[in-house]
Amino acid sequence: MRALFPGRFQPFHKGHLAVVKWSLERVDELVIVVGSAQESHTLQNPMTAGERVLAIRRALEDEGIDLRKVYIIPVPDILMNSAWVAHVRTYVPPFEAVVTRNPLVKVLFEEAGYEVLEPPPFGREKYVATNIRALMALGDPKWEEMVPRAVAEIIKELGIIRRMRELSKRD
């Protein structure tokens, strides 16, 4: 079975990594959908889709995950929830299930006839991308504890912290 795992991954954190591992214990292949692919260079979406793809791929490689079982595909947003599942389907290989804890995503895919696999919360209270981005914008190194080592390296290598600090400045 092939399953879809959608998210913005701004940034890809240890909770996301745990969901990927959990999913690959249950499905043959996993399609990681990098959502809001058109968004970047904002405090809410600091990384480009390509930067997120690179960070996710390096994190999975670093963890020894077989990349032959994983697709990482950027998908831009549309502003119509009722058409979103069909929109996503145009970007990804066929799939039978979706991995999510998001109530809206769950409803949309269930209504479209897909099986929903709901992973455990995996440190949901600790691994919150909004909090990670806030720490990054402040220059607080604690954010590094919340993301896979490879993701922290990519973020530093690409200058994402500097980008966020600049974006957080006031006129």
Swiss-Prot record:
Broad class of enzyme this protein falls into:
transferase
GO terms, molecular function: ATP binding; nicotinamide-nucleotide adenylyltransferase activity
Location relative to the cell? Cytoplasm
Reactions catalysed, semicolon-separated, are: beta-nicotinamide D-ribonucleotide + ATP + H(+) = diphosphate + NAD(+)
Work out whether the entry's keyword set contains Nucleus.
no
Which GO CC terms are listed, alphabetically?
Answer: cytoplasm
Pathway(s) of this molecule:
Cofactor biosynthesis; NAD(+) biosynthesis; NAD(+) from nicotinamide D-ribonucleotide: step 1/1
Biological processes per GO annotation: NAD biosynthetic process
**E.C. number:** 2.7.7.1
InterPro entries the record matches: Cyt_trans-like, NMN_Atrans_arc, Rossmann-like_a/b/a_fold
Q: Which UniProt keywords apply?
A: ATP-binding, Cytoplasm, NAD, Nucleotide-binding, Nucleotidyltransferase, Pyridine nucleotide biosynthesis, Transferase
* Pfam families assigned: CTP_transf_like
- HAMAP family, per this entry? NMN_adenylyltr (MF_00243)
Per its UniProt record, what NCBIfam families does this chain match? arch_NMN_Atrans (TIGR01527), cyt_tran_rel (TIGR00125), PRK01153.1 (NF002243)
What the entry lists under PANTHER family is as follows: BIFUNCTIONAL NMN ADENYLYLTRANSFERASE_NUDIX HYDROLASE, PHOSPHOPANTETHEINE ADENYLYLTRANSFERASE
What protein family is recorded? Belongs to the archaeal NMN adenylyltransferase family.
Task: Output this protein's name.
Answer: Nicotinamide-nucleotide adenylyltransferase
Q: Which organism is it from?
A: Ignicoccus hospitalis (strain KIN4/I / DSM 18386 / JCM 14125)
